[in-house]
Amino acid sequence: MRKTLLATTCLAALLSTTAHAETTITTATTAPVRTSTIKSGAPDDIKITSTGSVKPTSGTAVTIDSNHKAINEGTIEISNVNGARGIVAEAGTVGSITNAATGKIIIDEPYAPTDIDNDGDIDGAFALGSNRVGIATLGAFTGNIVNSGAITIEGNDSAGIRLGGPLTGNFTTDGTVSVLGDRALGVGLQDVAGNVRLAGTITATGLDATAARVARSSSRAT
């Protein structure tokens, strides 16, 4: 049974550092980036502007592994790779994660289900790949997490946003989150010590799919 749930080149040449201690990515790169080394080997905040993109061939596109923030106003994309991640914050870090209104995080695959027997109903698996996540934390994280843009994920056992530990800060998603695949999860939260806002559109499509799951919260929902 199908189940659909709806709730409303050289990297150095591509980077610049602004006066307020923020390293910006303004053009396309295929190299993954980390807050701990983004500023010529030194730590800094990362901002992908609307003209910038990070599109590695595998792994995690943006990693927060120091006490800094990551802002995406452009495009983060990985295609057809199991285990791929868009933005990941390592356990114990302090900062913030923002997928802005113009930001896109796409972790997808070329496969698309079709109507094999021409009965007007899509046949076959929803997705072939697995374990893909748009935004993730690997443990406790301190700082706000905001999605006002678009997160598109294709893969079984995959998630749009999945927190792997408690969040000390506010959580907001008022953009779009779309996940396709069996056991898909749109948004998954652990304990949140802050405000939680689930708005915009959250879509999880597949067998045993879940649009939103909040394991526990000491926050105020809005």
Question: What do these predicted ranges mean?
Answer:
Residues 133-136, 159-163, 185-189, 210-213:
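Structural detector for internal amphipathic alpha-helices that build alpha-solenoid repeat scaffolds
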Residues 92:
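Short, basic/aromatic recognition patches
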Residues 22-31, 44-58, 71-83, 96-131, ...:
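Beta-strand-rich solenoid/repeat architectures in extracellular/passenger domains
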Residues 1-22:
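Gram-negative bacterial Sec-dependent N-terminal signal peptides
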Residues 65-71:
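Short, surface-exposed polybasic-and-hydrophobic patches located at secondary-structure transitions
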Residues 4, 165, 200:
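Flexible, active-site-adjacent loop/turn segments at secondary-structure boundaries
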Residues 61-63:
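Charged, amphipathic alpha-helical stretches
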